[in-house]
């Protein structure tokens, strides 16, 4: 893909694309809720919306996203015991590149789909992938490993040089 200029999608829209791929062709319209107190949700909030793309095409994309985590630009998202699928993105602009990652897990029983977008963060693997890894691990395991706690601290202490032109 070609990534020049600014991205016109929101992170929520990118995450919903990831959910559509993870679910092999359907998504649930995102909603913002304050809380759910044990009452049955209106079906409006859980209605599956299907694309017109054959499931077999999604299976191919999922395999590619898994391969990216096992040996491609998303290697940093690989977690023990969790089959993570992902795609990096690098958007060139007037300043430093933007770092993006879209992913979901587990591959065959998806529970989480995420998007990470860090303006001026560099290549997708620099910020997007490690932040995505931490989010997936925390959500699915409830806590980070000691190594990933250290990674989280290191990422929090990084400094992004906004607006610095690299080309």
Predicted region positions:
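Active-site beta-strand/loop architecture of penicillin-binding DD-peptidases
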Residues: 1-50, 56, 62-146
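Gram-negative outer-membrane assembly/targeting C-terminal domains
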Residues: 140-167
């Amino acid at each position: 893909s070609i990534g020049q200029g600014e991205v016109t999608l929101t992170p929520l829209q990118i995450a919903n694309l990831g959910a559509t791929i993870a679910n092999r062709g359907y998504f649930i319209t995102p909603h913002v809720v304050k809380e759910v107190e044990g009452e049955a949700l209106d079906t409006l909030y859980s209605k599956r919306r299907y694309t017109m793309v054959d499931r077999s095409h999604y299976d191919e994309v999922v395999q590619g996203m898994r391969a990216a985590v096992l040996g491609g630009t998303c290697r940093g998202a690989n977690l023990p015991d969790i089959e993570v699928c992902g795609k990096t993105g690098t958007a060139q602009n007037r300043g430093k590149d933007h770092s993006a990652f879209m992913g979901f897990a587990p591959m065959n029983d998806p529970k989480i789909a995420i998007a990470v977008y860090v303006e001026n963060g560099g290549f997708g693997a620099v910020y997007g992938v490690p932040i995505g890894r931490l989010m997936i691990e925390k959500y699915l395991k409830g806590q980070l490993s000691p190594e990933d706690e250290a990674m989280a601290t290191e990422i929090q202490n990084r400094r992004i040089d906004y607006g610095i032109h690299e080309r």
